[in-house]
């Protein structure tokens, strides 16, 4: 019997064979500190109109949702988790959410936002994908389709094309954080990119000469360079230069997470900046030495929590119009494995935060953790479709029609209704 809980309260890592393969998301562009592929001029908006921002964060490698948001009151939880279980009492106790679910102790910023009703959790969630390949799982998560296969566009890019124009939103295209455009943002809509600077910045004179050359010899490359220079000017205007633009660790390093979050927040907060963005953090494939309240996963979750704080600080001027969603390709096994970690699973969690979020809630149609309740006898069984969450956000936060969501953005999802009550 499922327990319905909707509370209202105050790329692959080492050890996974896919890590050695070349990513399908190869570099699509290069530059100095910025990567850009297209450019869209800003659209004037009516004074006083709502100006929403949406940021999608992808945790690559498969987040262990049973550790991030442990169901501490499920009678089967502690025995299944063994050494990686999160305790409800003690020095490193889980942070309370609603009496049934709790939060990993490394996520203090998220816990505060939850208490302030600016953050929520959706548990036992997954895409339609039921296999356990990182690449296929991430492709399905980002493409928005109901099955894996060759695709050339992502659902967030298609959402940009369907976004209403005029007074409700001022859009300047999408923003990708990192050295390549993620699949979720690929497509016909305009996209620009930013990444921490890894080589010395080119001088203005060199940039001008290259632009003149490309505009005469290769107009398409000239457009891309012009877009990159435009984004560079925006980054400089927002103070993302010098030491702030130097890499502070990889995408799986807490410092790298925080730096990427700071860059995304500053660019999204700019009055003439983009309104929709995506970034990803690697390293969540915790097959071995995962740890419980402390250890490898705790370090990653602490970095993610630091990124949440950076979002809140950097987006402060527009925080009330901001929604952030954090997702992963699939979950991990319910049982601890023989190397004190967890293996590829199915159901997991998604996080929502921001001033536009109707927070203080855990959305969960809880399936239970007894063996007969697990998916294939090993995984948390998903009872919610990630597409329902995406649809609810895009409909209620960005004003995209249900018809466009079902037909263009998430084809084949007519049976998946957008989730209600996610935003204010």
PLM feature spans:
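Short glycine-biased active-site loop of nucleotidyltransferases that positions the nucleotide triphosphate
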Residues: 133-134, 338-344
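Feature for exported/extracytoplasmic and membrane-associated proteins, marking the mature portion
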Residues: 2-314, 335, 349-353, 358-424
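Metal-dependent active-site segment of extracytoplasmic phospho-/sulfohydrolases and closely related
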Residues: 308, 312-339
């Amino acid at each position: 019997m499922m327990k319905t809980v909707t509370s209202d309260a105050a790329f692959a890592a080492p050890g996974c064979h896919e890590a050695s393969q070349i990513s399908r998301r190869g570099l699509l562009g290069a530059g100095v500190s910025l990567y850009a592929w297209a450019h869209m001029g800003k659209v004037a908006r009516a004074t006083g109109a709502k100006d929403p921002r949406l940021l999608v964060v992808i945790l690559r490698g498969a987040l262990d949702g049973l550790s991030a948001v442990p169901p501490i009151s499920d009678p089967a939880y502690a025995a299944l988790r063994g050494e990686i279980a999160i305790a409800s009492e003690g020095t490193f106790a889980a942070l309370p959410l609603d009496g049934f679910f709790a939060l990993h102790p490394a996520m203090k910023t998220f816990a505060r936002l939850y208490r302030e009703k600016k953050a929520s959790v959706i548990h036992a969630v997954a895409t339609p994908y039921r296999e356990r390949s990182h690449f296929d799982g991430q492709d399905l998560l980002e493409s928005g389709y109901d099955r894996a296969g060759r695709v050339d566009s992502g659902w967030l890019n298609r959402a940009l094309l369907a976004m209403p124009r005029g007074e409700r939103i001022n859009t300047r295209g999408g923003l990708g954080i990192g050295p390549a455009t993620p699949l979720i943002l690929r497509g016909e809509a305009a996209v620009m990119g930013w990444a921490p600077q890894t080589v010395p910045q080119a001088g203005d004179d060199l940039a001008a000469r290259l632009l003149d050359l490309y505009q005469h010899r290769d107009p398409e490359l000239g457009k891309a360079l012009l877009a990159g220079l435009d984004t560079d000017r925006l980054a400089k205007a927002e103070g993302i230069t010098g030491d702030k633009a130097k890499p502070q660790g990889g995408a799986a390093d807490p410092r790298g997470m925080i730096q990427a979050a700071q860059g995304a927040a500053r660019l999204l907060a700019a009055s003439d900046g983009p309104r929709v963005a995506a970034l990803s953090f690697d390293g969540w494939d915790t097959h071995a030495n995962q740890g419980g309240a402390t250890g490898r996963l705790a370090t990653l979750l602490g970095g993610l929590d630091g990124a949440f704080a950076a979002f809140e600080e950097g987006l402060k001027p527009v925080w009330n119009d901001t929604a952030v969603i954090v997702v992963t390709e699939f979950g991990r096994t319910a049982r601890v494995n023989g190397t004190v970690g967890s293996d590829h699973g199915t159901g997991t969690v998604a996080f929502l935060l921001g001033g536009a979020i109707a927070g203080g809630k855990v959305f969960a149609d809880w399936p239970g953790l007894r063996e007969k309740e697990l998916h294939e006898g090993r995984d948390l069984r998903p009872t919610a479709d990630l597409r329902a969450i995406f649809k609810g956000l895009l409909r209620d936060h960005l004003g995209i029609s249900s018809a466009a969501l079902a037909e263009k953005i998430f084809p084949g999802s007519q049976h998946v209704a957008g989730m209600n009550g996610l935003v204010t």
